[in-house]
């Protein structure tokens, strides 16, 4: 189901049924500031979404080939798996945190005796991603109006993205939403909860103020997003 969050920003609710659901976001830069930044998809859902991601895009009036780029918050199957459903129509670059690119490309082997490391080792073998133009991002890098913030913990290369014109922070799995507030994810889904909590505190102190908190799981907060992030940071 597609939901408009504000001018030029849409939520794409992807996956199957809870808890196998995740959020992706579509941002039309030209609708925000009149500039030709094109169409950006933030995360892509699972390899099998119901409804399919192409149908979600169609609900906003776009096709996969209209997407100019994909920004990935982190390498987990419920955030990158939908790339298989976008290809071959989508042929733009896919941006991901430098450390997570090493994970998915095999440049770094996840720790074998760690619950999430073992999961990522299995993911690389069981769910192959399409041959796309992967491009690494680091703290402070900018792409089409988005600024990347390195927020490790859930994954080593987890990124959050800030878009000033949209007054929106795309937070991935740094935080989840529960009962209208932000919370940290389940420990079993993260590499290092200590680093994750540090990332929450660090992001709350260095990201500019924003209205919309757009996370990977839960209902986006449409107002007071940065206040909600600071409230969480004060509690972890």
Predicted features, each with a name:
Residues 1-14, 34-36, 50, 70, ...:
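Haloarchaeal acidic low-complexity proteome signature biased toward cell-envelope/secretome components but also
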Residues 40-42, 71, 94, 168-170, ...:
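Residue-level marker for buried hydrophobic side chains located in beta-strands
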Residues 67, 91-98, 115-117, 170-172:
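Short hydrophobic/aromatic-enriched beta-strand-loop microsegments
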Residues 50-96:
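Active-site metal-binding motif and surrounding structural segment of the metallo-beta-lactamase
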Residues 26, 34, 138-163:
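Core dinuclear metal-dependent hydrolase active-site scaffold
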Residues 46-48, 99-150, 156-231:
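Metallo-beta-lactamase
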